[in-house]
Amino acid sequence: MVTGTLTFDLLLGDVHSLKEKRSYVRPIVAELRRRYAVAAAETGALDLHRRAEIGVAVIAADGAHCREVLDGCERLVAGRPEVELLATRRRLYDEDD
């Protein structure tokens, strides 16, 4: 069993309020959950209007499948025109960690 985590650091477009920020972040989180069956949430930069951090976690039987799912998640977020992907952090943990 392998657990994978992926964190996205995002720069949002012309956002002036936290309400506007939620309107950008919520659809991304929902799409990650729906398309890839992962746990996803806004995990950081909660009080900043133009920045967002989204965290994703997945559990799989093997590392290859875990990497495949995380790669798909990264492609989905990178392909969103309303956000700029500044950085990603990926970690894989197996049963021995």
Segments from the language model and where they lie:
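N-terminal first-folded block
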Residues: 1-39
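A structural signal for short, well-ordered beta-strand segments
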Residues: 6-10, 54-56, 88-90
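A general secondary-structure boundary signal
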Residues: 9-11, 42-46, 67-72
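Glycine-rich, flexible loop/turn motifs
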Residues: 14, 44, 88
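Residue-level signal for beta-strand positions within conserved beta-sheet cores that form or flank
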Residues: 36, 52, 84-86
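Short, charge-patterned binding micro-sites
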Residues: 41-62
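C-terminal structural segments of small proteins and small subunits
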Residues: 60-97
